[in-house]
């Protein structure tokens, strides 16, 4: 395997589809943080059709290798460069608290609702982002070839577990104040 799975494009795309079918359940919402399919438009349409067979809702956060997905808006629930999603503990009982996630293909130094304890999920940098994730910021590389994902699709439960460990018993506000990563005047 190379940085993004098998060495050739066809092998990569087959690997993604096989993993998808082994992991994703009917009606799941899947957030793809870019570089989804690296094939031509015809192959992309075929592969997206195979992925959508399970009735999943695919949200694409555009990456630098997503040219073949341009103008395929009917294949996605949403297409964004940055997507912010609120997950409620009342809906997902495994969440330690309500969780806001700001997703982008690229790591961000500042992201929406960071002062309130939101998480930045990103990909793009492959396995080369430990210097970003090891700090106090609430950002996490969830790219398939990241150490966190370990060549598997990451679930909300895994992200919630990481968040709980990072907070270490604190509320998001307490964590932000204690970590001193935000000037206190910006915390609401």
Feature locations, PLM:
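Non-catalytic interaction surface on structured domains
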Residues: 15, 21, 182-188
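Core catalytic region of metal-dependent phosphoesterases/phosphodiesterases
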Residues: 1-87
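Conserved beta-sheet core of the metallophosphoesterase superfamily
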Residues: 74-186
């Amino acid at each position: 395997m190379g940085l993004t799975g098998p060495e050739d494009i066809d092998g990569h795309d087959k690997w993604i589809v096989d993993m998808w079918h082994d992991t994703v359940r009917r009606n799941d919402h899947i957030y793809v943080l870019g570089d989804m399919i690296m094939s031509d438009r015809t192959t992309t349409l075929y592969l997206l059709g195979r992925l959508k067979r399970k009735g999943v809702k695919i949200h694409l956060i555009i990456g630098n290798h997503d040219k073949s997905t341009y103008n395929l808006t009917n294949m996605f629930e949403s297409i964004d460069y940055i997507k912010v999603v609120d997950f409620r503990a009342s809906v997902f009982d495994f969440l330690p608290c309500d969780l806001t996630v700001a997703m982008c293909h690229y790591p961000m130094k500042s992201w929406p609702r960071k002062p309130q304890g939101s998480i930045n999920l990103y990909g793009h940098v492959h396995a080369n982002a430990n210097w970003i994730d090891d700090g106090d910021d609430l950002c996490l590389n969830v790219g398939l070839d990241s150490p966190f994902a370990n060549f598997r699709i990451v679930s909300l439960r895994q992200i919630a577990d990481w968040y709980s460990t990072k907070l270490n018993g604190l509320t998001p506000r307490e964590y932000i104040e204690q970590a001193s990563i935000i000037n206190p005047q910006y915390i609401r």
